[in-house]
Amino acid sequence: MRFYTGQHRHYCGIDLHAHTMYVCILDSAGEIVLERNLATTPEAFLEAIAPYRGDLVVACECLFTWYWLADLCAKEQIPFVLGHAPT
């Protein structure tokens, strides 16, 4: 298993569902700077992360809904990490 070791100013974790997503962004000190439930749309996501885009990495769990988010991050040049929950 490979672990992500990149260092960033902000870290975004997403609990992604079909219609909603819970977004939490931490700064490099581990303090929460954003915690919000959003509609699962590119527009809502990009608006929420806009203030933190300078140095942000996005991560979500490998579920059936992750493809669009990975594609959006690639298009927007946002580092993206796909996590696998241990069994």
Where are these regions (language model features)?
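Phosphate- and other anionic-substrate recognition elements at nucleic-acid/protein interfaces
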Residues: M1-T87
